[in-house]
Regions:
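Alpha/beta-hydrolase superfamily serine-hydrolase fold, recognizing
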Residues: 1-301
């Protein structure tokens, strides 16, 4: 049954890949951005254990750092998926690390977290090769990448969680996190829960008794969680309720949090991760500016 479901989901993500490729073909990269590509953050030769670095060609001194984790339902995509988005972040005066990680069904979500943490360890050990300010770091992610980023931020401040997920302390402090449409509740009723449990390597059609598939199960183990900006929109059919729920959880637990909940724009619903899909659109550009301002506020805090 699970193999059949994976085949169905794989077809869905294949259609999504074609749509994303067409969307990217309509866009242009910003000018004046230096790219350094395909650094191997693990020495195993895996094509998904690579990351890129982008930053303005003309800059003065060290730049604040953004580390991005792409979305794609834990099954689809690599660093190329968010390249345009990341370069437009870099164009706002930041140095951006953009990583790939292994995908389901080859691996499960906990193993993807191990990949993300391995990339962060490499970044920590190699940051001084780049014009990067290690005292100013924001972690970002969208959709599935938002979930991975949300959990990674918890791992950064929690030794018990690092032991549970079998990851090392990667040695980075996040000034803040930006989570766009994070799918942070994966053991829930309905199709979303069935899909989420499969991504964790669990049976899809029975509620999982293992801990930590839902973010509210780990927040109490992560004191000192960094300030969080959450982004969703009226047409965010995958994660509107989840993003709002995570914002409410942060408020209850005393985490500094801000929610950007976009209504209709020019009479139309803004889709899931709209600013990531088209960062220079009339709706995406001001959203990106808000993200940059949020980061700069927490550099100065």
């Amino acid at each position: 049954m699970e193999q059949t479901l994976f085949k169905i989901y794989d077809k869905f993500w294949g259609v999504t890949e074609k749509k994303d490729a067409a969307n990217h073909a309509r866009q242009h990269l910003p000018e004046g951005i230096k790219e350094e590509n395909d650094f191997a953050y693990l020495p195993d030769g895996h094509r998904y254990h690579l990351l890129d670095v982008y930053y303005p060609e003309n800059h003065e001194g060290k730049l604040p750092v953004v580390i991005d984790v792409h979305g794609g339902g834990w099954m689809y995509g690599d660093k190329e998926l968010n390249k345009i988005y990341c370069e437009y972040i870099a164009a706002r005066g930041f140095l951006v690390f953009n990583m790939s990680y292994r995908l389901a069904p080859e691996v499960t979500v906990p193993e993807q977290l191990q990949d993300v943490c391995a990339a962060l360890k490499w970044i920590n050990e190699n940051m001084d090769r780049f014009p990067a300010d290690r005292n100013a770091i924001m972690l970002t992610g969208d959709s599935a990448g938002g979930q991975l980023s949300a959990y990674t931020a918890a791992l950064s401040v929690s030794e018990p969680l690092r032991r549970h997920f079998d990851v090392e302390d990667f040695g980075l402090h996040f000034n803040c996190v930006t989570l766009t449409s994070p799918v942070a509740y994966m053991n829930v009723p309905g199709y979303m829960g069935a899909y989420g449990r499969m991504m964790w390597g669990e049976p899809p059609f029975q509620r999982c008794v293992k801990p930590y598939l839902n973010f509210d199960e780990i927040i109490d183990l992560a004191p000192g969680y960094p300030p969080a900006l959450l982004i969703t929109s009226s047409g965010d059919f995958m994660a509107l309720k989840q993003t709002r729920a995570l914002h409410e959880l942060f408020m209850r637990k005393g985490v500094s949090t801000k929610l950007l909940d976009y209504p209709k724009y020019e009479g139309k619903n803004l889709p899931h991760v709209f600013a990531v899909l088209d960062p220079e659109s009339s709706a995406g550009k001001p959203c990106m500016d808000t993200v940059a301002a949020f980061f700069r506020e927490h550099i100065q805090a």
